[in-house]
């Protein structure tokens, strides 16, 4: 070993003439460890897109407003005393301090109406006529599109590797998929030709099982997008065959090697989310790469089935096992920030909302539906200026009283 090191030192000694003939070849060898990879990095930092974050700031207010909706409508005569708000809001886990629920309702006079009870002479709260109309329009829109909801649920169950999905997981994501409250009857039991409810073998959970897979429903939303791109923009068929619509957020750094990696990934073949891959050998590196791209296609299709092209990351995780999705979903989605966007606005950063980027343009859904439009009417009421609302004298005194208490504290 000593002899080897001595000879190596003599060879690399710059004072010796022999080094001039060997050093160039050494430089060529040293280039390899520092060469850039042409694969998409596994770990990437999240780049904020303020358009989606601002959208979620409004959604955060709407989420609390909807909870108060349900609270008020559950009371007799659909009214509630202001004095009971603190206790009931604490039970709902809304995170309000003392007197904050009443102050919150005052911010949205187009949704909540505070008035003095004519007999008891105490303040009560009820929904405004505009808010009640919005609830009625959304309810009617959900009922009118039950045939579409049946199709969405069929496609969702068809994506499962077992042909069944837990009923409770669908119930939790009912609002995102535009299903009515009684979907177990109106969507599942009312269509026995498509679904059947079965009990779990080891648990008491119920499962939604598909009766028969329909090949006509196995066409993904991204395939229709590719056809439009091919026909309208004249893009080469080979370039668009396995590609996704990629639109990176502002400020996302795209280097030369990253661009090459995306170019290679766009042309990588993959299995359809509706294809049964249980009999395939997935041990090779190429099969693993195809499986990862299939996971992107599964999440893309899952978001395409939602009414607003968005869903929380936590609810995607419910379908992880039945759709063969990766364990670390957040890190996986951050690899594809040109396709998806994860917003952490809402619930103090604990809630992660995943958007399908191609589904939105300038803060609005590209292809709006009746349910989405009905829900946006509530957003308009929330964002409407309080100055345009008619506020009676008793309400003004109540608001001034809250301000005085804040000053004392």
Swiss-Prot record:
Domain of life of the source: Eukaryota
Membrane-spanning ranges: none
Signal peptide residue numbers: none
Gene Ontology BP annotations: lateral root morphogenesis; negative regulation of cell population proliferation
UniProt xrefs under Pfam families: PORR
GO molecular function: RNA binding
Chain's role: Involved in pre-arranging the maintenance of the active cell proliferation during root primordium development. Does not seem to be involved in cell cycle progression.
This protein's name: Protein ROOT PRIMORDIUM DEFECTIVE 1
Organism annotation: Arabidopsis thaliana (Mouse-ear cress)
């Amino acid at each position: 070993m000593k002899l080897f090191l001595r000879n190596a030192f003599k060879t690399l000694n710059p004072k010796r003439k022999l080094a001039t003939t060997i050093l160039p070849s050494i430089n060529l060898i040293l280039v390899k460890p520092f060469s850039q990879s042409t694969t998409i990095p596994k770990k990437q930092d999240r780049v904020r897109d303020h358009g989606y974050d601002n959208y979620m700031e409004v959604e955060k207010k709407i989420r609390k407003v909807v909870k108060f909706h349900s609270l008020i409508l559950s009371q007799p005569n659909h009214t509630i005393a202001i004095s009971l708000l603190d206790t009931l809001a604490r039970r709902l886990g809304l995170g309000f301090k003392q007197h904050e629920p009443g102050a919150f309702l005052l911010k949205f006079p187009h949704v909540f109406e505070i008035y003095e009870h004519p007999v008891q002479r105490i303040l009560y709260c009820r929904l405004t006529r505009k808010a009640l109309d919005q609830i009625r329009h959304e309810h009617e829109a959900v009922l009118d599109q039950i045939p579409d909801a049946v199709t969405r649920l069929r496609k969702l169950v068809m994506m499962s590797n077992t042909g069944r999905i837990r009923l409770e997981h669908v119930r939790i994501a009912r609002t995102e998929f535009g299903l009515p409250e009684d979907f177990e009857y109106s969507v599942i039991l009312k269509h026995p030709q498509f679904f059947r409810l079965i009990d779990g073998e080891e648990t008491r959970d119920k499962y939604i099982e598909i009766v028969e897979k329909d090949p006509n429903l196995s066409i993904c939303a991204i395939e229709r997008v590719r056809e439009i791109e091919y026909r309208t923009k004249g893009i080469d068929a080979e370039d668009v065959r396995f590609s996704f619509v990629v639109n990176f957020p502002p400020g996302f750094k795209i280097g030369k090697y990253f661009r090459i990696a995306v170019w290679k990934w766009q042309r990588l073949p993959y299995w359809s989310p509706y294809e049964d891959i249980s009999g395939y050998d997935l041990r090779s590196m190429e099969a693993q790469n195809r499986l990862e791209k299939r996971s992107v296609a599964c999440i893309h299709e899952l978001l395409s089935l939602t009414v607003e092209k968005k869903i929380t990351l936590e609810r995607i995780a419910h379908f992880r096992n039945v759709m063969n999705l990766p364990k670390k979903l957040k890190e996986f989605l951050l690899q594809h920030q040109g396709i998806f966007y994860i917003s952490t606005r809402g619930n103090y950063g604990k809630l992660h909302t995943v958007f399908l980027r191609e589904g939105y343009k300038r803060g609005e859904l590209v292809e709006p539906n009746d349910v989405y439009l009905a829900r946006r009417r509530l957003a308009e009421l929330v964002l409407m200026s309080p100055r345009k609302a008619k506020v009676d004298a008793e309400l003004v005194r109540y608001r001034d009283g809250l301000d005085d208490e804040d000053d004392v504290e």
